[in-house]
Amino acid sequence: MNLIIWPTYLDSRKSRSEGRRVPLEYAVESPTASEILRAARKLQLEASMESDRAYPPSWWESSGRVVVEYNGKKSELLPKIARLVRSSRKR
């Protein structure tokens, strides 16, 4: 199953009502679609980036999105990806 992951889902500057889907302890400031793509590939998932897309509630910000082939729940995958993005920034 293909899951779409928008950078907003992992953004610590966004509230839950604005689209963040992970707890603040996992969220990062201004994540990019390319960081999410690298994290998904690190988890050995089939993933592709669509850089010309914008998150519908904030259509004026062209943030891009990542499409991931994953058979589990999105709510299980997002914290894993967020942790990898966060740890890659600490290096």
Curated annotation (Swiss-Prot):
Membrane spanning residue stretches: none
Q: Which UniProt keywords apply?
A: Cytoplasm, Ribonucleoprotein, RNA-binding, Signal recognition particle
An example molecular function term from Gene Ontology annotations: 7S RNA binding
Tell me if Ribonucleoprotein is a UniProt keyword of this record: yes
Source organism's superkingdom? Archaea
Q: GO cellular component terms?
A: signal recognition particle
**Classification via InterPro entries:** Signal_recog_particle_SRP19 (IPR002778), SRP19-like_sf (IPR036521), SRP19_arc-type (IPR022938)
Swiss-Prot/TrEMBL GO biological process terms? SRP-dependent cotranslational protein targeting to membrane, signal sequence recognition
Subcellular location(s) of the protein: Cytoplasm
Name of one Pfam family that matches: SRP19
Protein family (similarity comment): Belongs to the SRP19 family.
Its biological function? Involved in targeting and insertion of nascent membrane proteins into the cytoplasmic membrane. Binds directly to 7S RNA and mediates binding of the 54 kDa subunit of the SRP.
Subunit structure, per the record?
Part of the signal recognition particle protein translocation system, which is composed of SRP and FtsY. Archaeal SRP consists of a 7S RNA molecule of 300 nucleotides and two protein subunits: SRP54 and SRP19.
> What is this protein called in UniProt?
Signal recognition particle 19 kDa protein
Q: Which organism is it from?
A: Methanothermobacter thermautotrophicus (strain ATCC 29096 / DSM 1053 / JCM 10044 / NBRC 100330 / Delta H) (Methanobacterium thermoautotrophicum)
* Upper taxonomic lineage: Archaea, Methanobacteriati, Methanobacteriota, Methanomada group, Methanobacteria
